[in-house]
């Protein structure tokens, strides 16, 4: 099939590469979000998908809005058979959805209808799920509600960050998306409606969502930190300054409890923080305006008092 691939961040690259290398399909163009300012210099930066498309000599469409008449006209001229999508990052209006013969087919990183929305992996880690997966479905105007062509499952490991899990799903999902493209071309694959029960939403994590509540149990603190890694990053405050947190882990067995948020002086190189249950070990921090550093080095420089705590 002649394909127009839509995607923006690095998580879309395994799928784009798989389709570019497929002997059965031809990616004739990509759709991605426009270049945007990034970094300290605020220089314009292309999306990872655009960078790969430029390397391969593909036509790039980067409309500010998918309803842009010039974009719709060009897409109509290309007349793709299908438009596979991975993390494009914008809603697609009905006029765009109607152009490809076989529609727009999206790789979504959850077992639909669970975790519809922008942050399915982060929300699954935050909720303490032990299993998730990916679904390939036909896009409809409603959010992530279209009929499903295929799914895969993936176990969530106890130490998985959202980044770890998303990396695995992106690779496995690329194989699934390619198989779905094959099945659509063969006419052997039928999309099935999503169940009406089990629907849940996965909105993007806000800055306030990832502020650590030290009065929560240690397991909840651990899930929050892992869910927010690598972005937006879990955080707390100390002496009225924001501190981003690296990974946490359970304190050694038998360690006495600490008041919620209380910092214990480094003990055998370990920085301990109190929660509602057992303390957690904090390995790395990123103080406001500074680079990441070992938590033990940071706390030695601050020398917190016995009554000081994260807030």
Swiss-Prot record:
ATP-binding among keywords: no
Residues annotated as transmembrane: none
GO molecular function (one): methionyl-tRNA formyltransferase activity
Catalytic activities: L-methionyl-tRNA(fMet) + (6R)-10-formyltetrahydrofolate = N-formyl-L-methionyl-tRNA(fMet) + (6S)-5,6,7,8-tetrahydrofolate + H(+)
A Pfam family assignment: Formyl_trans_N
Binding positions ((6S)-5,6,7,8-tetrahydrofolate): 110-113
Renumbered residue ranges of the record's region Disordered: 33-52
GO CC annotations, alphabetized: cytosol
InterPro entries (alphabetical): Fmt, Formyl_trans_C, Formyl_transf_N, Formyl_transf_N_sf, Formyl_transferase-like_C_sf, Met-tRNA-FMT_C, Met-tRNA-FMT_N
Disulphide bonds in the chain: none
Keywords: Protein biosynthesis, Transferase
Enzyme Commission number: 2.1.2.9
Family statement: Belongs to the Fmt family.
Biological role stated in the UniProt entry: Attaches a formyl group to the free amino group of methionyl-tRNA(fMet). The formyl group appears to play a dual role in the initiator identity of N-formylmethionyl-tRNA by promoting its recognition by IF2 and preventing the misappropriation of this tRNA by the elongation apparatus.
Name of this chain's protein: Methionyl-tRNA formyltransferase
Species: Parafrankia sp. (strain EAN1pec)
């Amino acid at each position: 099939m002649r394909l127009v691939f839509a995607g923006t961040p690095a998580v879309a690259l395994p799928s784009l590469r798989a389709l570019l290398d497929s002997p059965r399909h031809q990616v004739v163009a990509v759709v991605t979000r426009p270049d945007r300012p990034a970094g300290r210099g605020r220089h314009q930066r292309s999306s990872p998908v655009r960078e790969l498309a430029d390397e391969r000599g593909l036509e790039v469409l980067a409309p500010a809005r998918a309803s842009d008449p010039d974009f719709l006209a060009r897409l109509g001229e290309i007349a793709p058979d299908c438009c596979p999508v991975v993390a494009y990052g914008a809603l697609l209006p009905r006029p765009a959805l109607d152009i490809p013969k076989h529609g727009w087919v999206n790789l979504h990183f959850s077992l639909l209808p669970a975790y519809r929305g922008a942050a399915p992996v982060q929300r699954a880690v935050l909720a303490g799920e032990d299993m998730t997966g990916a679904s390939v479905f036909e896009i409809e105007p409603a959010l992530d509600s279209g009929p499903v062509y295929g799914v895969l499952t993936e176990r969530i490991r106890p130490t998985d960050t959202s980044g770890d899990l998303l990396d695995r799903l992106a690779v496995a999902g690329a194989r699934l998306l390619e198989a779905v493209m094959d099945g659509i071309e063969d006419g052997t694959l039928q999309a099935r409606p999503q169940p009406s029960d089990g629907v849940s939403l996965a909105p993007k994590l806000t800055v306030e969502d990832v502020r650590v509540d030290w009065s929560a149990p240690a397991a909840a603190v651990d899930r929050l930190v892992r869910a927010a890694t690598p972005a937006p990053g879990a955080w707390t405050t100390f002496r009225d300054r924001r501190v981003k947190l690296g990974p946490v882990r359970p304190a050694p067995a038998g360690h006495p409890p600490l008041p919620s948020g209380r910092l214990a002086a480094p003990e055998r190189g370990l920085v301990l923080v109190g929660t509602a249950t057992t303390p957690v070990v904090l390995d790395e921090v990123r103080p406001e305006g500074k680079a990441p550093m070992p938590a033990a080095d940071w706390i030695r420089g601050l020398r917190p008092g016995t009554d000081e705590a994260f807030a």
